[in-house]
Every structure is written in structure tokens, then in C-alpha cells.
């Protein structure tokens, strides 16, 4: 295998050069599972080991078909609403977080709850609560109806307005333009979010920024890696599910960064051979909720089509690990 091409950050927009001619794959690093997804999936696995099936999970634990199907076969039961869980049963809240009303509903049904909310989502929840206490108008940049946005907005429903995209800014009104802050969903396109914020700031010049970045490190890192390789690719394949916000954003980022085409696939079988007509360089990455086994399947399929040379394109090294929820942590010996 050719050596890793370490683009680094901030040099992510530089050209990828590896000295390889002919068909090749540029493989984005980092890709796949982030710390929050790893924690959430392991939470369900540990809950099943500790309590046995069934373990109920409110919403998909993460937005990936393979992961959800695998956990369902192991005994996880996925439900949309809390009242679908039998009284007294165990329920896991997904990585996307829930509104406070969901905790109240669970307590009323005497459910044993395990909260697998990503700590970075919890951070945004805490910001919403803090600024609501100070009576700010909170402009939450995010996708209307996404579980994470519903949960964050639920922390302060009287103070939060969801701003779905840059064009939605025109409809935003606030009580006091000097007490406005923006927060964001953690899985958005960095570029589109900044465009939305730019327009908000034009309208509200004293708009405050979040205390720290709300778009998570993994979302940003995966977008940077795609930006690094996309200019060299005629095609970028993003492994991920259609309901995965961060995976869909990677397709958009690839197209915006110069790839001629970009497609989202759940499995290797989803690759249409006609996509490869006239293509020399294929970029491959995966969303933050995608296990590596699915990427390996895509690489194997591409090798069958003659793309056996794989060059990693590294823009960051991720080492972050989140502690498991206390309810399912291993007992100390």
C-alpha cells in the first residue's frame, strides 16, 4: 500500500499527491465511528449483556441501518415514543438526546432509564438551559424535526427558534436584538452553518457565539478529510444511511469541494457500476455512525472493479473516548 498522505489541518485544501497512476481509492482518515456513537452502541450492547433481552431503545440508537438491525437481532427493541415501552422496563435514550419531557414521561411509567446521549449533545443542552435562564433568544441552527434538534429545543421551548438554513434567517424575529445567541446541531455542514450565522449576524450585529464549538470534532474532522481528497476525485462514495445528517452533509461537502459526483450508500451492494465509468480516482469515507466493516465491504467491491490501490488521506488523528453511562459501567474489582 502506498504511504499515508498526511494533509494536516490547516492544509486540508491542498492537492493530494501520491505518485500513483491508474485506478485508485483515496481513503479518508478519520472516518466512521466517533466517540459518541461508540459509547452509544456499546451502551446498548452492555445493557443487553447485563439485563438480557429485551432492552428498549427510544429512537434509533444511532442513524445507521446496519447498526440498528444488528442490535435488534441481539434483542434491542426500537420504539418511537416512551409510551410504547412496558411499565417498569429498561429503556436507553439514543445518542441524539431527548427533551426533559421525555425524562418525565419515563419516570411516570417507572422506566429504568440509561441515557446514551452524546456528551457533546449534552453540552449544547446545557448551553440552551443556561442562556434561557438569562432570558436570551436562542437561535438553534439545525434541521427541523431532527431528534437532536427536538431534544435541544425541548430544554427551553419558550426561548429557542430553529433556523434550518441560511434562507430561513429572513423569518427570524427576536424580542431584544442585544440578547441573542446562536447554538447549533452537532452534525451540520460547517460551511453552511457559518453562512447561516453570517446572515444572522447581518440581521443581529450583537449576536453572541456559543461558549465553544457546537459542531462536534468528528463532524468537522470528517468534512475536512473529504475536502482534502475531493478535488482529486471524479467520484466520492460516502458510506452512511440517508437519515444520518452528518453522512448526508459529507456528500454535499464532497460535491462542493470539487468531486464530479458523490453518492451515499449503506452497503457495498448499493454501488452502481455505471458510477465508475471513466473514473480513475474514487474517494471513500463514512459517516460518524458507520462501523468499519461496511467500509471494508465497499473497498472489497471497488477492488473487484479494479480499484485495488488504496491511499489513506489523513487530516487528523482522533483519540477521544467517552465514559459509559454509570448504569452499565463494569463493576470495579
Curated annotation (Swiss-Prot):
Give the binding site residues for [4Fe-4S] cluster. 34, 118, 216
Question: Disulfide pairs?
Answer: none
Q: Which cofactor does it need?
A: [4Fe-4S] cluster
Q: In which pathway does it act?
A: Isoprenoid biosynthesis; dimethylallyl diphosphate biosynthesis; dimethylallyl diphosphate from (2E)-4-hydroxy-3-methylbutenyl diphosphate: step 1/1; Isoprenoid biosynthesis; isopentenyl diphosphate biosynthesis via DXP pathway; isopentenyl diphosphate from 1-deoxy-D-xylulose 5-phosphate: step 6/6
- Which residues does the Swiss-Prot or TrEMBL record annotate as the active site? 148
Which residues are (2E)-4-hydroxy-3-methylbut-2-enyl diphosphate-binding? 63, 96, 146, 186, 244-246, 289
**Chain ranges passing through the membrane:** none
Reactions it catalyzes? isopentenyl diphosphate + 2 oxidized [2Fe-2S]-[ferredoxin] + H2O = (2E)-4-hydroxy-3-methylbut-2-enyl diphosphate + 2 reduced [2Fe-2S]-[ferredoxin] + 2 H(+); dimethylallyl diphosphate + 2 oxidized [2Fe-2S]-[ferredoxin] + H2O = (2E)-4-hydroxy-3-methylbut-2-enyl diphosphate + 2 reduced [2Fe-2S]-[ferredoxin] + 2 H(+)
EC number(s) on file: 1.17.7.4
Asked if the record carries the keyword Cell wall biogenesis/degradation, the reply is no
Q: What class of enzyme is it?
A: oxidoreductase
Q: Which GO molecular function annotations are given, in alphabetical order?
A: 4 iron, 4 sulfur cluster binding; 4-hydroxy-3-methylbut-2-enyl diphosphate reductase activity; metal ion binding
UniProt keyword terms in alphabetical order: 4Fe-4S, Iron, Iron-sulfur, Isoprene biosynthesis, Metal-binding, Oxidoreductase
Q: Which domain of life is it from?
A: Bacteria
Gene3D superfamilies in the record: 3.40.50.11270, 4-hydroxy-3-methylbut-2-enyl diphosphate reductase, catalytic domain
Q: Does the keyword Metal-binding apply?
A: yes
Instruction: Give the family per the record.
Output: Belongs to the IspH family.
Function recorded in the entry: Catalyzes the conversion of 1-hydroxy-2-methyl-2-(E)-butenyl 4-diphosphate (HMBPP) into a mixture of isopentenyl diphosphate (IPP) and dimethylallyl diphosphate (DMAPP). Acts in the terminal step of the DOXP/MEP pathway for isoprenoid precursor biosynthesis.
Name of the protein in question: 4-hydroxy-3-methylbut-2-enyl diphosphate reductase
User: Which source organism does the UniProt entry give?
Assistant: Mycobacterium sp. (strain KMS)
